Amino acid sequence: GPRRAILYTSLTPGQLPLDQPIDAACGALAIFVGIDDATGNLLFVANRLAWYPDSLLGDLKMDIGLLETIQNSKPLRGEEYEAFYQMLAAAGRTAAGELSRRAYNQLVHDAKQLGDKQREIEAAGLPLSEDDRIEEAVLETRLDYMRKNASHPFVPLVEHPDRFNGELIMLRGTAYRIVKVRINESEIRKRFGIDHYYQIDMRVNLEHKVKLITSRTAEGEEDKIREEKIVTQHPATFCALSLPPGMPTGDHLLEPIRVAGFYFKNWQYQTAEMRGDQAAERVAPMLIGRAPVWD
């Protein structure tokens, strides 16, 4: 029958409490070191404890504790690759169209919550402060955007990325670049059965105009130069395991797509645009999913 085991590990998920009983689905790639003579417990050591909570990603066997390694508004780092490939593999375990259906259902639920909140404000019948009027206008704008585009509001994904890591999101936009990325690491190919994925760079229409503020350091100067401009579109990146039949790849594309994927991070990347003698840097939400819908 089942035997009690003791695992010694250097890393545990930060959301799991210490020094108290828990009931959590966990696992580890561990080394068996022996049996405790006094208790008969099996003894193991491992680098980290994997956590599979009752959530879509947890059900798809992604170690949710790896989301804690992600740093938003920074380039993709080596420490994040395990989370990246586990999320990619998790997307591959879904049925065709499953992520789109689930994301749409979540979108309907979120729209209902926003609608309920909007009605609460209207039903109160109280004089609105300036902040309340702004909140009401934002709610109305986001609801209108969700209903017309069947996609999640985009601006919060950039303003508050820490709220969305690991969440299922649906976006609609235009793919302007699609490249096939080959995975060179043999261990990754063997463990996950993945030898490539597609990076889709797309532009998404925003729910409202946004002031984009960037900074750069001029050549020979120490102080950063602040730059501002009003934008109505924003880039996003979608990493997919496959493409629809016949979908083109390369640069200078104008392909209408819908994507449903897990929000990995708001990542920083270099663009083809030059500022002085350096490539300009931008940040954009990165989603990971099974395949885009080509409209």
Positions of predicted regions on the chain:
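OB-fold and OB-like single-stranded nucleic-acid-recognition modules
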Residues: 1-295
